[in-house]
């Protein structure tokens, strides 16, 4: 016999599964894993933009400053800010008539 004929057998009313009332630990574990997988898949599809954006940009916060003295942290912040600051003297203003 095939697995299909052993698990699902036609009855007088309709198709039924013999293992639906089973208390076999393997069946219970498979059911729990299946339900958890379905819930996680639904959550992933609902919130995938938020989740992957957080993973993509949330992890790029710069180097850790744990264990670094406050004076060095401030110096680092100033260096980063000075690298970002733009010198207005390098731009040419063009006035259209």
From Swiss-Prot:
One Pfam family, please name it.
Answer: Flu_M2
Bilayer topology: Single-pass type III membrane protein
Q: Family, per the entry? A: Belongs to the influenza viruses matrix protein M2 family.
Subunit composition and interactions:
Homotetramer; composed of two disulfide-linked dimers held together by non-covalent interactions. May interact with matrix protein 1.
Q: Cite the ranges annotated as topological domain Intravirion.
A: 44-97
Q: Which Gene Ontology molecular-function terms are recorded?
A: monoatomic ion channel activity; proton transmembrane transporter activity
How is the enzymatic or functional activity of this protein modulated? The M2 protein from most influenza A strains is inhibited by amantadine and rimantadine, resulting in viral uncoating incapacity. Emergence of amantadine-resistant variants is usually rapid.
The reply on keyword Protein biosynthesis is: no
Note down the stretches annotated as region Disordered: 60-83
Which residues carry the S-palmitoyl cysteine lipidation? 50
- GO cellular component, as recorded: host cell plasma membrane; membrane; virion membrane
Q: Name one GO biological process term.
A: protein complex oligomerization
* Additional remarks: When the channel is activated, one or more imidazole moieties of His-37 probably become bi-protonated.
Query: What is the superkingdom listed in this entry's lineage?
Result: Viruses
Name its cellular compartments: Virion membrane; Host apical cell membrane
At what residues does the UniProt record annotate the site feature described as Seems to be involved in pH gating?
41
**Entry domain remark:** Cytoplasmic tail plays an important role in virion assembly and morphogenesis.
Main function? Forms a proton-selective ion channel that is necessary for the efficient release of the viral genome during virus entry. After attaching to the cell surface, the virion enters the cell by endocytosis. Acidification of the endosome triggers M2 ion channel activity.
Site keyed Essential for channel activity, possibly by being protonated during channel activation, and by forming the channel gate and the selective filter: positions: 37
Residues bearing Phosphoserine are: 64, 82
- What ranges are annotated Virion surface (topological domains)? 1-22
Query: Which residue ranges traverse the bilayer?
Result: 23-43
| Protein name in the entry | Matrix protein 2
């Amino acid at each position: 016999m095939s697995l299909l004929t052993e698990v699902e057998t036609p009855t007088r009313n309709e198709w039924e599964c013999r293992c639906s009332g089973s208390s076999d630990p393997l069946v219970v574990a498979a059911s729990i894993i299946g339900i958890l997988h379905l819930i996680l898949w639904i959550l992933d599809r609902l919130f995938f933009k938020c989740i992957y954006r957080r993973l993509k940009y949330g992890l790029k916060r710069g180097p850790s400053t744990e264990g670094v003295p406050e004076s060095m942290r401030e110096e680092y912040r100033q260096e980063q800010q000075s690298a970002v600051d733009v010198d207005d003297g390098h731009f040419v203003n063009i006035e259209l008539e």
